Design a protein with these regions (language model features):
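Active-site metal-binding loops of divalent metal-dependent hydrolases
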Residues: 49-50, 88, 135, 185
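N-terminal beta1-alpha1 cap of cysteine-dependent amidohydrolase-like domains
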Residues: 1-85, 92-99, 105-111, 143-145, ...
Length: 210
């Protein structure tokens, strides 16, 4: 398995993501934001952080980068799997690769905590816990889109920490090859962190690509 981890100015979860990939025996390479081709990789990660300082809005500038343009070509070619975590989820929505948008948390405060989640996948053990850390994690979408969007939901908050519509914490696109989520599975892989629920997500990616 060969993973590419896209690094923008302001990305800060790239190392965590690389270590998590290597825990599963994957080759993991950093990809700078000016890269114009991603086709060498089985899975592409857009990790968390504050791409371009979150100027304009979270993900609002990253969507214009060469790497995101290359990501769109990667998606068209059906080459592999794409996962955007936290800021990566924001970028996927800004780029139009996932529906809806991520807005400022209700209460306007940055939230950093361990949160309960309910996962819509039989490979997961019902309820899990993962870290979150974001100021713009409130998922929103037009009301007339919500019926279709709810069919794409992969993970929901059990105790909504940010005011997300319908408790949405993460969702797929229609192909089930693009996944965006606000919680951080890469921060819950090693036993030293006291929580290994993030391993289920990496195991899911392996299963998707078999």
């Amino acid at each position: 398995m060969k993973a590419g981890i896209v690094v923008f100015p302001g990305t800060n979860c790239d190392r965590d993501t690389k270590l998590a990939c290597e825990f599963f025996g994957w080759q993991a390479d950093y990809i700078w934001h000016d890269e114009s081709s991603l086709h060498d990789y089985d899975v592409i990660f857009l990790p968390g952080g504050f791409s371009y300082g979150d100027y304009v809005r979270a993900g609002g500038l990253a969507k214009f980068s060469p790497a995101v343009l290359a990501l769109k070509e990667y998606v068209k070619s059906k080459r592999g799997f794409v996962i955007g975590i936290c800021n990566g989820f924001q970028i996927l929505c800004e780029a139009g690769l996932l529906p809806g948008a991520l807005s400022v948390n209700s209460g306007t405060r940055f939230v950093c905590d361990l949160t309960g989640l309910s996962v819509n996948n039989t490979k997961f053990p019902g309820k899990i816990n993962l870290p979150i850390a974001h100021g713009e994690g409130r998922y929103v979408a037009p009301e007339n889109m919500m019926k279709d969007i709810n069919e794409l939901v992969f993970v929901k908050y059990t105790d909504n920490p940010n005011g997300s519509t319908d408790d949405i914490a993460g969702l797929y696109d229609r192909s089930n090859k693009i996944l965006g989520m606000m919680p951080h599975p890469e921060r819950a892989v090693f036993e030293e962190t006291g929580n290994t629920d993030g391993r289920y997500f990496f195991e899911l990616i392996e299963a998707e690509l078999r």
